[in-house]
Amino acid sequence: MHIQVINFGINVSHEDFVVGATELAPNFASIPGLISKHWLGDEENKVYGGVYVWESKEHCEAYKAGEIFSMVMSSENHVSPTSKDFGVLEAPTKITT
């Protein structure tokens, strides 16, 4: 398992972001190796993003080489996007999941 966290500011309203995200969500549902994506939003500070749970680091790397990731990172509505990957500590995670 592998975790990716993407954060960015937005230059649209919260409501417009939610509408756009809801329209885009089906595109993420079919990405190979993506177990889940949790959409994040901090309306007060206009910071949004997602926590992606991948089957493997290789699946995450394949996503980062693809069109959807490129779109997320270069969208005119996203301000200063960042992406950070994390390995999962399996032993303690098994206890808490």
Residue ranges, per PLM feature:
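Short S/T/G/P-rich N-terminal loop/turn motif that feeds into the first structured element of a domain
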Residues: 1-48, 57-65, 77-97
